[in-house]
Structure formats: C-alpha cells, structure tokens
Amino acid sequence: VLNFGHTFGHAFESLALEKGCPMPHGVCIAHGIVSALVLSHLRLDCPSELLHRIAKEIVAPYYKTPAFTCDDYPRLLELMRSDKKNAIAGQILFVLLRNKAIPEIDVPADDREIAAALDITRDLLGS
C-alpha cells in the first residue's frame, strides 16, 4: 500500500529529470497518486468523489503540475515498465484503491488504460 502512486510518480520524476526540469519527489508522487486514483476509478470503480476531492482540493492547489503531453506517453510507459516493482516481465503493476482504505495490490494495466489515466490526470490538474 505504501507504493500507492509511486509507479506513476517515479515515471513523472524521471521524465522531468530527462527534460532538464527536475521536480521534487513528493510533488511527483502527489501527481502519481492522482493518476493512480484515476486508474482505480477506471479499473476498480473507486468512487469519483474521492478522486475529485484529492485532485481538486489537495493536489492541484498546492503542487506545480508536471509538464507532460501525450507525446511523452511512450517514454512514461517505458519508465513504468522498468520500475523495480514490476517483476512480471512486460506488465505494469499498480497499487490501486477500490475505495478509501480498500487497496488492491499488483493490479496490471495495459497501455491503453494507462494512457486514459494520463489523459484524465492532465485534464484534472490542468496540464
């Protein structure tokens, strides 16, 4: 459960470093939590109210939005695949939430689902 948001967050952090605009680890993880909540909603029907509250009331007002576009998705996916937590070759695994305090661990998601989560994250956070 400790890794909630980290698969996305570490990819955001690595991409920011590659682009020459490093962002603090905590900021990247905060945005990763929003992406993980989006994916939780898409995959596990986590309540949208929880997602919107975290995104709009907690993350967006206080953290600079990571600058990524859909052109960055292939690189973000590559970074996620190389994450040390993804032990199953080729699969990207996530800690997701069914609801507040009800986690699911090692939930696989395909590229299409991850891209959809990234699109929605960008919409929610104004990227």
Which residues fall in each region the model found?
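C-terminal charged capping/lid subdomain of soluble metabolic enzymes
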Residues: 45-127
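Active-site segments that bind and position negatively charged phosphate/pyrophosphate groups
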Residues: 1-74
